[in-house]
Structures are given as C-alpha cells and as structure tokens.
Amino acid sequence: MKVLICYFTGTGNTRLCAQFLANHFIEEKNDATLYEVEVGNDNVPNPNDYDLIGFGYPIHAFNTPEIFAGFIKKLPKAINKKYFIFKVSGEPFPPNNSSSHHIYRKLKRKGYRLIMEKHYLMPYNIIFKYKDELQKQMYLYLDPLTKVMAIRLTRGEEDKIRYNLIHTVWSFLLRIEWIAPKINALFLHNKKKLCTNCMMCVNNCPTKSLHVTKTGKIKTTSKCALCMRCSLNCPTKAIHMGIFQPWIVTGGFHYKKLAKDESNNGTYINYRTKGYFKLFRKYYLKQNELLRKYNIEIPVKYNEENQLENLKK
C-alpha cells in the first residue's frame, strides 16, 4: 500500500508524529511518503497516486490551523479516496474532538472518505511549559500509539467518525482565532539587545512571514500562523510575541535527552495526579487499554499504587 502523509507543524510535535507513523507504515510493509506543508514547498504529491492519505496538524484553539485548511482547499478532486487524520494538542479536552470538522466537510466535497482520526497529546508550546516528567511521558507514548494506528490502517480497519454538535459549534466560534495572528503581527518583534541576528527564526519560519526590515528589526506579516516556532527555539529568547508574550514557552523540546534520563520515570500522569492534570488520567488509561488490545507494551512503568487502572476500582 502506498501511503502519503501530509502535515503542518509549528514546533515539531506534529512532524515527529508524522515521522513515527511513516516508520511504522514501512514496518508493516507499506510505502510511506512525507510532505510538510509550508510556504515555498510547492512540490505537492498528487493524492490520486496513493492508496491512503494521512493529514496531520497541531490543534489551534480547537481548530485546524488556517494554513492547513488552505492546503486542503487546494487539493485535487478524488473518487472515494480513503484518508485518516492525526492531530496533536497539549490537552485532552472534548472540543478538540471536532477540530477537523471544517476540513472534513471540504474533503468530503472533493471525494475523500475519512476512515480514522486520532488525537495525540504532546507538550504545550504556549501558555506554560510542561514539566520534564510529563514531556517524557507524552513522547514515550507517541511512538507505540502511532504504531497502533499504522497497524489498524494496514489491516483495513475503519472507524465511524461522528462530530458532536456542541463541540462543532465551539470549534466554529473559536475559528476567530484565525484573525489573531494577523492582529498580533503588528506587535511581534525581536528584542534588539538579545538578538544576535543568527536568522534562525527567519530561515525556519513555515509561512516565510518573518523578515528583517530596513531598520534591522525582525517583524512578521499577516501570513503568520502563530505557530510559536520562532519564540520556542530562539537561542537567546529574543522574540517578543506581541499580545501573546505572557504565554510564550522557550527553550525548545529535547525529547531524546529526556528519554535517556533514568532519573525521570515519565509517569507524571498517574492515579494520584491532582489539579489540572487530573483531567488527563482518563486519556492515558484509554491509551493503555488500546496498547494492550494490540499487544504493544505500555511505554512507562507505573508502580502498583499509581497505576491508572486503579481508576476502575
């Protein structure tokens, strides 16, 4: 089976998810091609040349990012072309379940048929930084969970996708978030005292909207996707994110380093988790059940008192 995986990524979590999926499809004796959606990457593979299409994106305010919705709009028509969706966010809140409804409608009109959709949790790149133990837990779960998806799709399994009306309305109303980057573009700039002019932010911007002005300032245009790539990865923390400055997360993600840290057991979400992250427990319990169903080892070791299965008692 020939699989095409098209995705947009801001700070790399969706790219990582896409790469894991591609690797697992190949393990299952399929061909897998990756295509990253960004301005200037115009060599778009034709979906009609593939047996199965994957579409992936980071959830922005319970929605598909505008740049990815624009990509979907430009796709050629097809005839009953099967596709799946994988999406990434930092929290398991129910309105995320309807984040794809907008592109689902577009794809249906073009002749594409949705057969599976999966929501993966990865660390926030905005609002606040997740603790290392939770970052490790999310990273370690991503690999086996994408393996399950690749196995299921290779076997020809399909899910019945239903979008909750209330969640869909929430998603529609919050699509106003598409306006936020355009407004915030007026205020985003570099802090000249901290900026070393390394040009990392300009060169790596997925929308190619960051640029250097005649006065030497780094500014952006209304094409900005507010993906947070520039602020997350700036080595000197020199990006001022305008209106969203109080919510920035810096320092990047270092998953491979965390994975090797034996002092970090990666079980931040467990039976005894309290506060905000208590809301994450049912998500991980459900993922454990899914992994067991497909005979895949749970990637972290919970002690008996903290295992999520205690929620059932």
Regions found by a protein language model. Give the residues of each.
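Short gly/ser/thr-rich secondary-structure transition/capping motifs
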Residues: 33-40, 215
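Nucleotide-activated donor-dependent transferases that construct or modify glycoconjugates
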Residues: 4-8
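FMN-binding flavodoxin-like domain, especially the glycine-rich phosphate-binding loop
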Residues: 3, 13-16, 24-36, 47-57, ...
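A mid-sequence, solvent-exposed acidic-amphipathic segment
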Residues: 168-198, 202-206
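Iron-sulfur cluster-binding cysteine motifs and their immediate structural context
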Residues: 190, 200-219, 229-247
